[in-house]
């Protein structure tokens, strides 16, 4: 989604990304019903710190359905599981959950994931150990 409501990193500098949040909202509301589950496979927010993502989560909370987020390579705000859950609870973001060292069960399926990327010519051992 690459949202940036809480930070100054607009996506409209890239061709094809003009009004992307408005288009996301309109298409989401057209397609997703309140009982649906949407899996967001990373790159949710450009915020660098969890606090900078609050407006992005407000945008997401106001869309229908349950949302499950996985960590993307641009989700630098991603913190510990405890801090992420406290953030959701403290802000009453009730329709959002994380897959983080666990899985989420929805509609009879277990959803799990991890950050992935294509290897360059030489894999980076530091990233491999961390991820």
Which role does the model predict for each range below?
Residues 107-131:
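Binuclear metal-dependent hydrolase catalytic cores centered on His/Asp/Glu-rich metal-binding motifs
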């Amino acid at each position: 989604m690459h949202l940036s409501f809480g930070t100054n990193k607009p996506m409209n500098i890239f061709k094809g990304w003009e009004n992307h949040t408005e288009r996301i909202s309109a298409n989401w509301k057209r397609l997703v019903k309140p009982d649906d589950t949407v899996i967001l496979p990373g790159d949710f927010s450009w915020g660098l710190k969890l606090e900078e993502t609050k407006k992005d989560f407000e945008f997401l909370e106001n869309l229908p359905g349950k949302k499950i987020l996985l960590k993307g390579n641009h989700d630098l705000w991603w913190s510990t599981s405890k801090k992420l859950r406290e953030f959701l609870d403290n802000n009453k973001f009730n329709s959002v959950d994380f897959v983080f060292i666990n899985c989420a069960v929805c509609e009879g399926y277990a959803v799990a994931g991890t950050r992935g990327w294509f290897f360059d010519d030489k894999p980076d051992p530091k990233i491999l150990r961390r991820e």
